[in-house]
Regions:
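A generic structural motif
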Residues: 88-95, 126
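Residue-level marker for beta-strand->alpha-helix junctions and adjacent short loops that shape enzyme
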Residues: 47, 67, 98-100, 206
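Internal, glycine-rich beta/alpha segment that forms the wall or movable "lid"
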Residues: 1-59, 63-91, 145-147, 155
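C-terminal amphipathic alpha-helical "assembly" element
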Residues: 54, 58, 64-78, 105-120, ...
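Short, conserved secondary-structure transition motifs
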Residues: 94-106
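Active-site mouth loops of central-metabolism enzymes
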Residues: 34-45, 99-100, 167-178
Length: 217
């Protein structure tokens, strides 16, 4: 809002000045008052994306994460923070965490496995799937290959079944109360180190949200 919106770049120009334009475009100044206190987040799990987010944004949504494996992110995030002269205290790592409370752990894991199989197996071409690469970086290389093979072959149920229990348990909160409470300790420890800022909890059960809130707040 400090001036008119003008830009001359390699791909884009404001106002548009192409040969097929009318030539009537004028740079405008916004009449709206921007709220600069609203934080800016990006969604990323790639090295370049994480570094860029740490440098330019206020936080990142890394889809899901294992709070014990900040080492997967650390080099990229540190690179971006250093470039911007920031620290982890200036940056929010906010993963999506699904919480499903129940005594049947396999039943609780099932919908999460289906979702993770979609990302690890089907989000992108065989040789260019960032989520598949991410699962490998977390230590599940063989499983990631198997999930992708099954998913791209149209065997979605088998792909979901191939998602390791350990991967679900590491990145989400599933099962009986005692199991969830125990796993929350790792998230607390990661929060104390600045490795996690906000947990974006997804839960269809009020009691699941209440459990997480009672332990974390």
């Amino acid at each position: 809002r400090e001036g008119k919106a003008e830009y001359e770049g390699y791909h884009y120009n404001l106002p548009y000045n192409g040969e097929d334009g009318t030539g009537l475009g004028k740079p405008l100044k916004s009449i709206l008052q921007a709220d600069t206190s609203i934080p800016i987040y990006t969604a990323s799990i790639t090295n370049t994306g994480l570094a860029t987010s740490a440098e330019l944004a206020d936080g990142v949504f890394p889809v899901w994460m294992n709070p014990d494996r900040y080492d997967v992110f650390e080099p990229s995030i540190s690179k971006g923070l250093q470039k911007a002269d920031k620290t982890l205290m200036d940056f929010d790592i906010a993963p999506f965490v699904t919480c499903i409370l129940g005594d049947d752990v396999d039943f609780c894991r099932a919908p999460i496995k289906a979702n993770m199989a979609l990302y690890i197996g089907g989000m992108g071409a065989r040789d260019k799937n960032f989520y598949n690469d991410y699962a490998k970086a977390l230590g599940y290389e063989d499983a990631a290959v198997k999930i992708q093979d099954l998913y791209l072959a149209g065997k979605k149920d088998e792909a979901a079944a191939a998602v390791p229990d350990e991967l679900v348990d590491a990145t989400h909160l599933v099962g009986p109360k005692e199991k969830i409470v125990e796993r929350l300790q790792a998230w607390k420890a990661a929060g104390d180190k600045g490795h996690v800022g906000n947990m974006l909890i997804g839960a269809g059960q009020p009691e699941a949200l209440e459990l997480v809130a009672s332990e974390m707040l």
